[in-house]
Every structure is written in structure tokens, then in C-alpha cells.
Amino acid sequence: MKVFILALLALTATTAIAQLETTCSQGFGQSQQQQQPGQRQLLEQMKPCVAFLQQKCSPLRMPFLQTQVEQLSSCQIVQYQCCQQLAQIPERTRCHAIHIVVEAIIQQQSQQQWQEPQQQAQHKSMRMLLENLSLMCNIYVPVQCQQQQQLGQQQQQQLQEQLTPCTTFLQQQCSPVTVPFPQIPVDQPTSCQNVQHQCCRQLSQIPEQFRCQAIHNVAEAIRQQQPQQQWQGMYQPQQPAQLESIRMSLQALRSMCNIYIPVQCPAPTTYNIPLVATYTGGAC
């Protein structure tokens, strides 16, 4: 009996996902043809999550079951499939996979529903749903997955120049200013404090969706100024101390600047630095 029930539930969930596949293929149109093979594969893998987040599943009515038997629904089955698929995706790719899920749902909504001012409410609702994936699946999902937009070489250079104060501060290439009037009971500002203020001010002027990339540029600038032998190979013995030093410096941004910075910035593949930066209260 239990085998029959589980088989029926699985069949229902499969039917729901099959219907979703038809909807997806109609909703994407030409944009789906432009997707890269990796994106199409991720979308196929994440279709249970799309179905669950859209609640395109309804409880199964089985009046023949006894009341003490758990009434599993097709949503529960799809939820399980969503978590199972998400767990199989590497952590570094989950943020991209979540964006694909959001994009799939947006594509299936009528364009009128995504116009201002309704757009902000829709995005807020979607963000809350995605944040629940972490608890629902009991796996790590980035709390805030910022849309990773491609920047041109000129924009990359501008970002790096804009955050030169941050590079200077994180490297502590500033020294206290000598004030010849120590008897004056006034806080003695240092050049480091001035650079810190400039860093926070520059970072606050960068749009949120580019701050993660900006932080990478800072780390890259610091890396390039280190002796090359310290950065050869991802697992060189002398490298962990350097990586930990930079990671701790980047974490200092959370208490240094009172602005939003992505909770976890995926590290570039060229140098696997676990960049982590959030914000807490406190002005520059």
C-alpha cells in the first residue's frame, strides 16, 4: 500500500514538472535559445525549485487514506526534489542557479506584473522565498545573491581606481599623523583614519550589484603587489597566511562602513580567497 502511494505521489510530481517544462519552453521563447548549455542544464536541474516557488503543485486528495497516515502533497514531493537538486549543485554555482530560477519565474509572469511600482514588491517576495531555501533544504544558500553583471575593462579599471583608498587602508600603507600639540584634548586623526573614511565613501558610491566585483578588484590589487612566489599555486604552504590576512582585512569592512556589502562574495577562480564582508552598525 505504501509503495503504491509513493508511486502515485512521484507520478503526480513528475506530471507537475512536465507541465512546468512546457510552460518554461513557451515562456522563454527566443531568450532560451540564447542561453548557454550550462545555463540550460542548470535550469533543467532547478525546475523542481521553480515549480515549488511558484506553488504549481497542490495537495493530493486521498480520501481512502486513514487520518493517522501522513497526507503527503505533490508540493512536498517537489520541495524534496528541489532540495535534492540544489544540494548537488556546487556552492560556487548555487548563486547563479538561483538567479536562473528567478529569471525563469520572471519570464513566466506577464510583463505588466513586473512594472514599477509592483516590481519592488515582486522582487521582495521572491527574495524572501529564496532566503527560505536555506532553511527549507538545510544547506548553504547565499543570503543575498547579487546579480553578477559583466563589466568592461574600462569599468574594471575605474572601479579599481575608485577603491584605491580601500587598497591602501587594507594594506595599512598609512601611518599616524604626527601632531605637535598633544596637550589639546582632541582626537588625533591619523592618515589611516582619513583613508578609511575615503574608502567607505567611495564604496558607498558604487551600486550594490557591483560592490562584490569591486571588492574582488581590491583583493586583486593587493595580490598583484605581493611577491609572486607567495601566490603561485592555490595550495602553496606560504599562501594560507596571506589569504587569511586579506580575508580578515576584508571582513573589517563590515564594521568600518555602514553600507550594504554582499554577505559572501564568491571568490574568483584565479585565486581562491574566501571573501566575506557584511555590514553592522557604525559610521565611518
Swiss-Prot record:
Q: What is the lineage of its organism?
A: Eukaryota, Viridiplantae, Streptophyta, Embryophyta, Tracheophyta
What are the protein's GO molecular function terms?
A: nutrient reservoir activity
Q: Which Gene3D superfamilies match?
A: Plant lipid-transfer and hydrophobic proteins
Signal sequence annotation: 1-18
What InterPro entries does the database record attribute to this sequence? Bifun_inhib/LTP/seed_sf, Bifunc_inhib/LTP/seed_store, Glia_glutenin
Protein name, as recorded: Avenin-like b3
Q: Which species?
A: Triticum aestivum (Wheat)
Q: Which SMART domains match?
A: AAI
| Coiled coil spans | none
Q: What does this protein do?
A: Seed storage protein. Might be integrated via inter-chain disulfide bonds within the glutenin polymer.
Work out whether the entry's keyword set contains Oxidoreductase.
no
CDD domains this protein is in? Answer: AAI_SS
Task: Supply the alphabetized keyword list.
Answer: Disulfide bond, Seed storage protein, Signal, Storage protein
Modified how: Contains disulfide bonds.
Family membership noted in the UniProt record? Belongs to the prolamin family.
